[in-house]
Amino acid sequence: GHIELAKPVYHPGFIKKVKKVLEIVCHNCSKVLADESDPEFVTAINTRDPKLRFKRVWAVCKKKRKCENEDRQDKNKDEEFAPGAKNVVLEGHGGCGNMQPQVRQAALQLKAAFEVTSEEGPKRKETVNISAEMAHGILRRISERDLHNIGLNSDYARPEWMIITVLPVPPPPVRPSISMDGTGTGMRNEDDLTYKLGDIIRANGNVKQAIREGSPQHIARDFEELLQYHVATY
């Protein structure tokens, strides 16, 4: 069977990978931050081994702090008529122009650190929590072409699958009840997995109830964190 979670939660085994993917793509339009006008990026996406390709693309993109949206056609107008110049049409990046945060991981949470420039004072850093739901939304919108470029397989390894939305539950024969005194005749008690599943179901019910009743933000967040904890320790 399975448990449908009220809110997505991070998978403790994949949270580092999710963090890296979030450093590669724009948090607003889900485009890869680098494009083919960058020779480093071109070299990176021409790597045959997908794992290595992911690593190289990540190294190029993690330095970028803006999703570029300028049109490159205008820049090359003067060079068009230079003798012997080949007319190469560069496709614009077509991003959204938003600034990109630095992604930080703290245990089972991801945080986005933005640099905010205020009119009077120096730059200051603002940290926003990236909920699993937000991350899931960003990862879900990545295009097939971008997935191929960053070395993920869209049939078998879509990035949004690294975030748990539905939790598989093993059937009872896999988690039989255990004898308390070791003789097999005395008191019988539920298996650890069954207890943990009970915790997850209760935490999930609390989150559902908080959403249904429109509870205050901080209460709903506490319940979500509890659900995240129980799923991670399952």
Where are these regions (language model features)?
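Conserved core architecture of multi-subunit DNA-directed RNA polymerases
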Residues: 1-234
